[in-house]
């Protein structure tokens, strides 16, 4: 009986581990199954070796490794905190967070930009009492990450792939992507200006109201005591001196009526950030504690990573490696030299950065290559996509991105495109739309669920359920997609 129970427990444990593995690596498993399904139609042969774009995979590995090293020493987070520290209203803070995400996505890819910036946004907005704007900030950051990286070849994986596949000159790439990028930035800025509230930190407003109420109560109390003292003085002259002394003591009480005891600041924890119930700027002004590091860029907040002098040389070295990899993307340096330098340097300086590389993304890309290569060799599929890509490559690319995501759409449709312009624009603006249009959007959705579950006491977050967040997300993304399609269609 005991052995039977142990057997059942082992089976349940194994099933639980398999289910967790599937949940954590859903995208990789789906792409692997899709690739295996196409093998039934196109058996493996020598042509499979031609599916893989080795340079794309190598350059993507180099960028991920160097960005992981820079993130490990806190460079991106430190820079973002310095930017956010200069803004004191909800609107300006949201704009700074979204703008930082957009700029970061140009150099660190969209998914890494979101991984680094979303926790910082949650900590900043929750600390200042702006949790009502958190869903909006997450949606705008998601759009900024997906659309901001389109301007550079290494801003997102599909750009890197198409840049290499079609051997696009850098000048031509920039000229094609300038219009959709400019429209995207303008739309994001407009939304931040219209829908982000220009309110000061909520805890500061509450403390100001409480302080004013305390003053009024103290003034009323002193007036009542004064009248009582005058009445007693008229009736009992024998106690006049004691009453006068008491009156002088009352008059000596501070006019502001502020309570003498300090108010404890409650704290909540989210990820690596401590989230207090007070505004960091207001807390410093009131003498309740030191200004936090993301408020001044320096100070006593030990949670804020700082680039100390001992790490500056390493940061410069990593920056040089990043420049080397980017030079290989632009075909200035042979990519084996750049990637080899990254492996050797990080193997000596920071092996953890090599372990933090998103190997799942690289394997997913390899599966996409097999899936797309096999589909291109199926006559019916080839005829279908060849016809529709000739009719409207922009709409096909954007539409396919809504269903299978923009990275596999770029890999698949590149086999049927006569030119790169419409395909390049379509898969980039196609990152807006459904939740699966860009795999980075899943990062944002999961992060929002995590934040909401971690702060159940915040009513503004409790009201916006994951379903309500998804509805808002879809509405904003659909509006962006429609506008971008209408603007870009006449020019590609």
Q: Where do the language-model regions lie?
A:
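Hydrophobic transmembrane alpha-helices that form the pore/transport pathway of multi-pass ion
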Residues: 97, 103-150, 161, 411-424, ...
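Long, contiguous bundles of hydrophobic transmembrane helices that form the permeation core
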Residues: 2, 8, 186-211, 215, ...
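Hydrophobic mid-bilayer segments of alpha-helices in multi-pass membrane transport proteins
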Residues: 20-41, 53-65, 119, 314-324, ...
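Interfacial loop-to-helix junctions that mark the boundaries of transmembrane helices
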Residues: 19-23, 46-56, 170-180, 309-310, ...
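Long, intrinsically disordered low-complexity tandem-repeat segments
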Residues: 207-239
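Membrane-interfacial loop-to-helix junctions in multi-pass transporters
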Residues: 54-56, 84-98, 127-137, 380-396, ...
């Amino acid at each position: 009986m005991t052995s039977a129970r142990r057997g059942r427990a082992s089976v349940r444990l194994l099933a639980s581990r398999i289910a967790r593995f599937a949940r954590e690596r859903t995208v990789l498993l789906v792409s692997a199954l899709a690739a295996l399904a196409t093998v039934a139609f196109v058996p493996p042969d020598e042509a499979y070796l031609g599916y893989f774009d080795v340079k794309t995979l190598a350059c993507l590995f180099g960028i991920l490794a160097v960005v992981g090293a820079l993130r490990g020493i806190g460079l991106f987070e430190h820079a973002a905190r310095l930017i956010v520290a200069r803004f004191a209203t909800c609107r300006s803070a949201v704009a700074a967070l979204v703008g930082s995400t957009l700029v970061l996505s140009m150099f660190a890819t969209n998914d890494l930009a979101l991984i680094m910036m979303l926790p910082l946004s949650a900590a900043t907005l929750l600390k200042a009492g702006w949790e009502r704007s958190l869903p909006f900030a997450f949606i705008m950051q998601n759009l900024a990450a997906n659309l901001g990286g389109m301007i550079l070849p290494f801003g997102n994986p599909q750009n890197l792939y198409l840049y290499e596949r079609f051997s696009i000159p850098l000048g031509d790439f920039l000229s094609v992507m300038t219009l959709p990028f400019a429209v995207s930035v303008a739309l994001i800025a407009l939304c931040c200006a219209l829908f982000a509230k220009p309110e000061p930190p909520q805890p500061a407003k509450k403390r100001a109201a409480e302080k004013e109420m305390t003053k009024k109560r103290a003034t009323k109390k002193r007036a009542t005591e004064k009248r009582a003292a005058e009445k007693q003085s008229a009736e009992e002259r024998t106690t006049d001196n004691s009453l006068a002394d008491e009156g002088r003591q009352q008059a000596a009480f501070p006019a502001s009526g502020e309570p003498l005891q300090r108010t404890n600041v409650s704290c909540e924890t989210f990820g690596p950030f401590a989230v207090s119930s007070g505004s960091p700027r207001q807390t410093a002004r009131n003498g309740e504690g030191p200004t936090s590091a993301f408020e001044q860029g320096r100070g006593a907040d030990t949670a804020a990573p700082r680039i100390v002098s001992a790490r500056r040389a390493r940061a410069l070295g990593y920056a040089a490696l990043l420049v080397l990899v980017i030079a290989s993307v632009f075909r200035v340096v042979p990519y084996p030299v750049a990637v080899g330098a990254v492996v050797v340097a990080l193997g000596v300086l920071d092996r953890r950065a090599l372990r933090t590389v998103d190997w799942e993304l690289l394997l997913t890309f390899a599966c996409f290559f097999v899936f797309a290569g096999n589909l291109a060799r199926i006559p019916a599929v080839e005829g279908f996509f060849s016809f529709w890509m000739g009719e409207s490559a922009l709409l096909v690319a954007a539409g396919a991105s809504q269903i299978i995501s923009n990275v596999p759409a770029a890999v698949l449709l590149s086999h049927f495109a006569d030119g790169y312009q419409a395909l390049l624009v379509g898969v980039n603006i196609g990152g807006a739309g459904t939740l699966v249009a860009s795999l980075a959007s899943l990062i944002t959705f999961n992060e929002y669920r995590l934040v909401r579950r971690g702060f159940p006491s915040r009513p503004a977050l409790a009201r916006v359920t994951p379903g309500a967040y998804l509805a808002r997300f879809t509405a904003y993304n659909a509006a962006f997609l429609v506008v971008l399609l209408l603007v870009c269609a006449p020019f590609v």
